[in-house]
């Protein structure tokens, strides 16, 4: 397992919902990654929908797959 120093965190937008709690996420740099939900998000029943801004954790060994570790709050004024 990679230590926390080796992990890369990036923000992105969910563009597609796939079976088994998998999501296609477009990162800030334009790349798309396949991401699954972390255990804490699953345990707290946080819903991830299309268009949500999320923080994705990537390992330097495989930059095509990641883990959604945080769903950013939407601005409540809009």
Curated annotation (Swiss-Prot):
One of its GO terms (cellular component) is cytosol. The keyword DNA repair does not apply. Its main location: plastid. It is found in: Plastid, Chloroplast. PROSITE patterns: S1_IF1_TYPE. Residues 1-73 form the S1-like domain. The keyword Chloroplast applies. Pfam families: eIF-1a (PF01176). SMART domains: S1 (SM00316). InterPro entries: NA-bd_OB-fold, RNA-binding_domain_S1_IF1, S1_domain, TIF_IF1. One of its GO terms (molecular function) is rRNA binding. Keywords: Chloroplast, Initiation factor, Plastid, Protein biosynthesis, RNA-binding, rRNA-binding. One of the essential components for the initiation of protein synthesis. Stabilizes the binding of IF-2 and IF-3 on the 30S subunit to which N-formylmethionyl-tRNA(fMet) subsequently binds. Helps modulate mRNA selection, yielding the 30S pre-initiation complex (PIC). Upon addition of the 50S ribosomal subunit IF-1, IF-2 and IF-3 are released leaving the mature 70S translation initiation complex. Component of the 30S ribosomal translation pre-initiation complex which assembles on the 30S ribosome in the order IF-2 and IF-3, IF-1 and N-formylmethionyl-tRNA(fMet); mRNA recruitment can occur at any time during PIC assembly. Belongs to the IF-1 family. This is Translation initiation factor IF-1, chloroplastic. It comes from Ostreococcus tauri.
């Amino acid at each position: 397992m990679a230590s926390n120093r080796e992990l890369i965190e990036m923000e992105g937008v969910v563009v597609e919902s796939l079976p088994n709690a998998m999501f296609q996420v477009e990162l800030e740099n334009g790349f798309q990654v396949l991401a699954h939900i972390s255990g804490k998000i699953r345990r707290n029943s946080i819903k991830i929908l299309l268009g949500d801004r999320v923080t994705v954790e990537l390992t330097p060994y495989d930059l095509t797959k990641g883990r959604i570790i945080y769903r950013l709050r939407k601005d409540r004024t809009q």
